[in-house]
Amino acid sequence: MDTSTLKARLETASATFNNLELQLADPDVASDPKKLETIARERARLEPLVLDYKELQAIDLEYKEAKELLRQSKSDKEMEALAQEELIRLEELEKDLVNRLTLALLPKDPRDERSVMLEIRAGAGGDEACIWAGDLARMYERYGLKVGWVVKAMSATEADLGGFRELIISVKGKAVFSQLKFEAGVHRVQRVPATESQGRVHTSTATVAVMPEADPVEVKLEPTDLEISTARSGGAGGQNVNKVETAVDLLHKPTGIRVFCTQERSQLQNRERALEILRAKLLEREIEEANAKERSARLAQVGTGDRSEKIRTYNYKDNRTTDHRLGVNFPLETVLEGELDDLIGACIAEEQRLKMEKLGNQSEE
């Protein structure tokens, strides 16, 4: 993004910010809580941008003054040296600020602020793949708890020898999707399974889908499209187990998507969870269809977000986790303990780099 384009967009943001300030002072807005919240949220989003722009304007003014001082100091070597030092300092400040502002103005994914549902499925590898799916679930649970998110199992199909054939986890918190969206894809593990008697290394996989939570207004469900049946739960529930039909089996007839919920103690709670999962799955389906049509959007992403894309290999023998999109290795034990900040941070930085590169190409056209 060239400087003139950057400043034009910052001027627009400043004008919008000033207009929002006026609206907040309007008694009609103050008496409408919903409108007040919307305007206040947008103002809060723009405020750091506007403050940085004011700082950039102040630096520009100081730079002009330092340049004029340099011009007038040709006969005073000491003053000339001081003016040159000041120019270098201001150039560095401006460079850092322009980079920060450019990143702030990059196109945002409107889903970034949402909570998510993680769907983890065992892939190739039989029983070991199910155990691996469980290991991934624990990794995300540890990371979520570390950063203060609320992590809860929504639906699970347990495997006979441990782990899960399929598991859906709700992860609630601030901007969860902005960080976990990079986890979508195939996660491959290379290790000696606990069930392997001859010490041979096996390769197994699990797929992860990251589904932003869908608002009921956003994804409307027609009652005629739903087929709901109940069953006796086989999970935790004390005296409820196998005596009361608390499990809910939900089928969305137009798409064939089926959701089975047993995690909650009551049928009503399981029904609500099943509908929540279904909305997220339908929203993910819409997003995948849109991405398939919008190829250019994928060029500015770290990976496609497709659950069939192999994104990472976890090699136990070498204690190494390789992210194939970045071509970078991370310590295996650290990653599995839920220490994902470095890995996710690298994905975010790469996505920003690609977006800036794309903006630069557009500016040249």
Curated annotation (Swiss-Prot):
Post-translational modifications reported in the UniProt record: Methylated by PrmC. Methylation increases the termination efficiency of RF1.
Q: What stretches pass through the bilayer?
A: none
What is the annotated localization of this protein?
A: Cytoplasm
Cite the entry's keywords alphabetically. Answer: Cytoplasm, Methylation, Protein biosynthesis
> One GO cellular component from the entry?
cytoplasm
Q: Does the keyword section mention Cytoplasm?
A: yes
Question: Which positions does the record annotate as the modified residue N5-methylglutamine?
Answer: Q239
Provide the GO MF annotations for this entry. translation release factor activity, codon specific
Note whether Ribonucleoprotein occurs among the keywords.
Answer: no
Q: To which protein family does this belong?
A: Belongs to the prokaryotic/mitochondrial release factor family.
Known PANTHER family for this protein? Answer: LD18447P, PEPTIDE CHAIN RELEASE FACTOR APG3, CHLOROPLASTIC
Query: Could you tell me what this protein does?
Result: Peptide chain release factor 1 directs the termination of translation in response to the peptide chain termination codons UAG and UAA.
Instruction: Quote the protein name from its UniProt record.
Output: Peptide chain release factor 1
Q: Which gene encodes it?
A: prfA
